[in-house]
Amino acid sequence: MGRGGARATAEAQPLPSFCAGELGSLRAEGGTPAADRASWGGFRPSDRDRHSRALEQEEHSMDPRFSRPKSGGVLEMIGNTPLLPIRKLNPNPKVELWAKVEGCNPGGSIKDRIGLSMIEAAEEAGQLEPEMTILEATSGNTGIGLALVSAVKGYKLLLTMSEAVSVERRKILAAFGAEFLLTPGHLGTDGAIERAYDLADQQPDRYLLVDQYNNPANPLAHYHGTAPEIWEQTGGRVTHFVGALGTTGTVMGCSRRLKELNPEIRVIAVEPHLGHKIQGLKSLKEAYVPGIFDKRLVDQKVNVADEDAFATARLFAKAEGLLVGMSSGAAVFAALELARSLERGLVVLILPDFGERYLSTNLFTA
């Protein structure tokens, strides 16, 4: 699809029914990078330049190899998530607000996309042997996405994560058969990352560290999947994209693709404050800055406080009828503030997951 053609002729498009995944002519998916697109494995933050070169060498076009996951079954349910109109909370009648509901993925979050993408990239690169254990540091959702794909494909999975993650996430991981090691809560996500690096260094023949923070297959899942879905679902009318920063893969992949389709699209990244309690997000002021992050792909960065994210998640459930998670609350808060400042436009924001996996936390108790 050309940069300007769709925008010039598009009218308001009928949007899919909730969790139906009907996208008309587009049959995009979770985006599974092929081995010849990026060579990776055991990346560290110091590999930023090598990663940037890999992305710059990408063919910026829809590749038929990415049209659907190759593994069949439940994996074909990943992607093609619906857009939900935000009506009651929308503060500006001249601005359209739409939320992409990633909780409709089979594992319950947007991280199913990258779980499939990273594992299939490793397979195609010949880096994942049947006897190896997949290893990753996670705040929960990526672990669940990896656990789902590992269960389907028959791989062993070991995850490191902060003991501060919700009980629901631990139970879901156990149900999928994944093993996990908990790191001290006060160390946050960085503590889990360091533990995963140590394990991979100690036994490189045993573990394949997928390293979502530095793995090109992470943003490529969104470049080839999430972003084209947004473009098609809005008929090319999207003017602003709002996404929260965790690994930064969602924002990086969507920004790169959407700006190729229309360079005027503005990308707003939502970042928590240092010491935050928003599970799934990461402050770039922490020790590990993701190697996949490229500040040139962000037009504006907005910091959201914990209390604003949590209060907005509670308000969203009561006003819009959808129970969403902590990071979703942060994204909605930023999108509402953005809508107030615009004269007109069409804003798409990402809701990474649903709220059921946070019921043991204080998210919905205030």
Where are these regions (language model features)?
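PLP-dependent amino-acid enzyme catalytic core
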Residues: 19, 42-44, 48-366
